[in-house]
Amino acid sequence: MVNWQVIGQLVSTGLIGLLGPAVIILLALKKGNL
């Protein structure tokens, strides 16, 4: 049996970990401040 709850938590945590820095970088690029 696959534990979808654990997989969902891992995926959501991974997405947040990847999207967090990406959003910060995009905001920095839009402001022109790196």
Curated annotation (Swiss-Prot):
Name of the protein this chain belongs to: Photosystem II reaction center protein Psb30
Q: Where is the signal peptide?
A: none
Give the GO cellular component terms, alphabetically: chloroplast thylakoid membrane; photosystem II
Q: Tell me its family.
A: Belongs to the Psb30/Ycf12 family.
Swiss-Prot/TrEMBL GO biological process terms? photosynthesis
Q: How does it assemble?
A: PSII is composed of 1 copy each of membrane proteins PsbA, PsbB, PsbC, PsbD, PsbE, PsbF, PsbH, PsbI, PsbJ, PsbK, PsbL, PsbM, PsbT, PsbX, PsbY, PsbZ, Psb30/Ycf12, peripheral proteins of the oxygen-evolving complex and a large number of cofactors. It forms dimeric complexes.
Task: Show the taxonomic lineage.
Answer: Eukaryota, Sar, Stramenopiles, Ochrophyta, Bacillariophyta
> Which InterPro entries does this chain map to?
PSII_Ycf12_core-subunit
Keywords (alphabetical) are: Chloroplast, Membrane, Photosynthesis, Photosystem II, Plastid, Thylakoid, Transmembrane, Transmembrane helix
What membrane topology is annotated for this entry? Single-pass membrane protein
One Pfam family here: PSII_Ycf12
Please state where this protein is localized. Plastid, Chloroplast thylakoid membrane
Main function: A core subunit of photosystem II (PSII), probably helps stabilize the reaction center.
Q: Does the record's keyword annotation contain Cytoplasm?
A: no
Residue ranges crossing the lipid bilayer per the database entry: 6-26
